[in-house]
């Protein structure tokens, strides 16, 4: 009989413990949202992103690739509506650098790696909160094997670099990182 009471008490204690833990877990939650973290949507609802001209003689498609990636990021990850004029936020700038430099030089002055660097100057203007304006140049690079022809890796490298620069711009302007 004592054994049955013990099992009953043990089962009751276990059920109560599980109930308490379950109620704690269902009532407590932590939510992180990194999209448009510093935008005050009560004041700011529109954005205009100008075309970024490519001031370098290389990779003529760079301007289009960058413009599309930047627009996509801001339109998909914020609640801002794109307009052609009188925007609350304006983003403009230019592609200032597209450079290939030798890396890891070895015997006979031959570089086993080549570095592709892209730099983009950005002017971010918040017409509702001017203290959040940003005027900065963002750069990123990727290294590739010098035995590979640039033409065979260029579009993939450009996409990777552009994605990284767009991340940096987004984080420096609206994500508040």
Regions found by a protein language model. Give the residues of each.
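Surface-exposed short loop/turn segments
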Residues: 76-81, 88-133, 141-152
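C-terminal/domain-edge helix-coil "capping" segments
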Residues: 126-129, 144-177
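A cross-taxon signal for low-complexity, glycine/charged-rich
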Residues: 1-4, 10, 15-19
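C-terminal segment of classical bacterial N-terminal signal peptides
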Residues: 18-27
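Soluble non-cytosolic domains of exported or imported proteins
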Residues: 57-65, 111, 115, 151-164
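A structural "domain/chain start" motif
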Residues: 26-71, 79, 100, 128, ...
């Amino acid at each position: 009989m004592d054994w049955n009471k013990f099992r009953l008490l043990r089962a009751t204690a276990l059920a109560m413990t599980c109930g308490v833990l379950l109620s704690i877990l269902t009532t407590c939650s932590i939510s992180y949202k990194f999209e448009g973290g510093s935008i005050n949507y009560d004041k700011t609802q529109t954005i205009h992103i100008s075309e970024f001209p490519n001031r370098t003689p290389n990779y003529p498609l760079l301007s289009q690739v960058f413009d599309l990636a930047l627009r996509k990021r801001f339109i998909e990850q914020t609640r801002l509506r794109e307009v052609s004029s009188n925007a609350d936020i304006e983003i403009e700038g230019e592609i200032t650098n597209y450079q290939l430099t030798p890396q890891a030089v070895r015997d006979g002055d031959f570089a086993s790696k080549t570095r592709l660097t892209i730099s983009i100057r950005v002017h971010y203007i918040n017409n509702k909160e001017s203290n959040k304006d940003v005027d900065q140049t963002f750069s990123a690079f990727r290294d590739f094997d010098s035995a590979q022809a640039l033409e065979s890796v260029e579009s993939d490298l450009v996409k990777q670099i552009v994605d990284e620069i767009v991340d940096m711009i987004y984080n420096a302007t609206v994500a508040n990182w």
